[in-house]
């Protein structure tokens, strides 16, 4: 091996060893609201201006921005800092809340993979580094707020992708139940885009009780393993990847019972892992999410096309279609 090749391999090894630094630094910038500050300012800002607006001292802010500029997150010209097309995706209205959720102690400490967890099938998410139950940790309250904000941001982005790239999904549909809707962000955005649709946000009673009102959306509390409100269509957005195959089949059967046999459909909005070598720009992201599921959810996973077909067949659906909405998720429409 020549010296240059060896040096390159060493550099790659160091990049892997320190790979956690980039998302950590980006999370710090989001926590300081740097993307929002630059976006709202409407133009480049000096270090002094950015320091005053963020409340972060100049020296550490300079070092943080230097790192993120090197990695292409922000831009700098004539000693002024500015947004890039990438950094705009980390504002509060985009993926900023998701970055903050990943930075909470409850998420960051336990979600790393370990050999022990892979051998035993034990979810690291339910244990802190001290071996205690993370859900009872005082930090969990903050984590749940961050989690809700992250899911809201994700729902907003995914609903926008559906509206933009697959509006035909709601042709002839008069009512839609969003199962596991939390505070109704996704169904609210869809009803706003397709005002003839009556939206039903369905989640556990204690969750919908805290939901703000949304025009065109009714909030219903219940348990998806017992029954699902009836509608022309049932939507499962980022729900089934949390559950085992058996539980998914149970959920899908309950959804099938809720729709008309002649015109109804179940819309699954979730990732599809590609194993055939032909992927798209989100293929790596989906594999990363599967690693998170491997560490976080003992039974959950991101599924391949064959695995989705198996679930649909076992749940009694006769046919299905798949639509690429140019997002991390696809829309799988299953028919009785």
UniProtKB/Swiss-Prot annotation:
E.C. designation(s): 2.1.1.-
Domain of life, source organism: Eukaryota
Biotech use, per record: Nevadensin is a selective inhibitor of human carboxylesterase 1 (hCE-1), a key enzyme responsible for the hydrolysis of a wide range of endogenous and xenobiotic esters.
Recorded catalytic activity of this chain's protein: genkwanin + S-adenosyl-L-methionine = apigenin 4',7-dimethyl ether + S-adenosyl-L-homocysteine; cirsiliol + S-adenosyl-L-methionine = eupatorin + S-adenosyl-L-homocysteine + H(+); cirsimaritin + S-adenosyl-L-methionine = salvigenin + S-adenosyl-L-homocysteine + H(+); scutellarein 7-methyl ether + S-adenosyl-L-methionine = ladanein + S-adenosyl-L-homocysteine + H(+)
Activity modulation notes: Substrate inhibition by genkwanin (GENK) at concentrations above 10 mM.
InterPro entries assigned to the protein according to its UniProt record, in alphabetical order: COMT-like, O_MeTrfase_dom, Plant_O-MeTrfase_dimerisation, SAM-dependent_MTases_sf, WH-like_DNA-bd_sf, WH_DNA-bd_sf
Listed GO biological process terms: methylation
Active site: 241
Top enzyme class: transferase
Tissue note: Expressed in leaves.
Keywords attached to this entry: Methyltransferase, S-adenosyl-L-methionine, Transferase
Pathway as given in its UniProt record: Flavonoid metabolism
Keyword match Methyltransferase: yes
GO MF, any single term: O-methyltransferase activity
Family matches, as Pfam families: Dimerisation (PF08100), Methyltransf_2 (PF00891)
Function: Flavonoid 4'-O-methyltransferase involved in the biosynthesis of polymethoxylated flavonoids natural products such as nevadensin and salvigenin, aroma compounds which contribute to the flavor of sweet basil, and exhibit pharmacological activities such as anti-allergic, anti-oxidant, antibacterial, anti-proliferative, and anti-inflammatory effects.
Family affiliation: Belongs to the class I-like SAM-binding methyltransferase superfamily. Cation-independent O-methyltransferase family.
Quaternary data: Homodimer.
Name the UniProt record assigns to this protein: Flavonoid 4'-O-methyltransferase 5
Lineage per the UniProt record: Eukaryota, Viridiplantae, Streptophyta, Embryophyta, Tracheophyta
Gene: FOMT5
């Amino acid at each position: 091996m020549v010296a240059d090749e060896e040096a390159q391999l060493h550099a790659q090894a160091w990049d892997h060893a320190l790979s956690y630094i980039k998302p950590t630094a980006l999370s710090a910038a989001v926590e300081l609201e740097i993307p929002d500050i630059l976006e709202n300012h409407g133009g480049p800002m000096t270090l002094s201006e950015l320091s005053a607006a963020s409340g972060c001292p100049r020296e550490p802010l300079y070092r943080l921005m230097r790192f993120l500029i090197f990695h292409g997150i922000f831009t700098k010209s004539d000693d002024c800092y500015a947004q890039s097309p990438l950094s705009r995706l980390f504002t509060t209205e985009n993926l900023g809340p998701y970055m903050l959720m990943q930075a909470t102690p409850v998420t960051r400490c336990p979600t790393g993979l370990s050999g022990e967890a892979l051998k035993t099938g034990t979810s690291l998410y339910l244990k802190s580094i001290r071996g205690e139950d993370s859900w009872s940790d005082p930090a969990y309250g903050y984590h749940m707020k961050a989690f809700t904000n992250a899911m809201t941001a994700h729902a907003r982005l995914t609903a926008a992708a559906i509206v933009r790239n697959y509006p035909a999904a709601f042709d002839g549909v008069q009512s839609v139940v969003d199962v596991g809707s939390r505070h109704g962000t996704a169904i609210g955005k869809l009803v706003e885009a397709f005002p003839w649709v009556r939206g039903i946000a369905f989640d556990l009673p204690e969750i919908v009780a805290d939901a703000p009102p949304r025009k065109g959306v009714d909030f219903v509390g219940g348990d998806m393993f017992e029954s699902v409100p009836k509608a022309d269509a049932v939507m499962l957005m980022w729900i089934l990847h949390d559950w085992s195959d058996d539980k998914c089949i149970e959920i899908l059967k309950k959804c099938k019972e809720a729709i008309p046999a002649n015109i109804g459909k179940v819309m699954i909005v979730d990732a599809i892992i590609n194993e055939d070598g032909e992927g798209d720009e989100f293929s790596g992201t989906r594999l990363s999410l599967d690693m998170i599921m491997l560490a976080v959810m003992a039974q959950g996973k991101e599924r391949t096309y064959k695995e989705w077909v198996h679930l649909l067949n076992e749940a009694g659906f006769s046919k299905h279609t798949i639509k690429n909405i140019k997002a991390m998720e696809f829309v799988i429409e299953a028919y009785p």
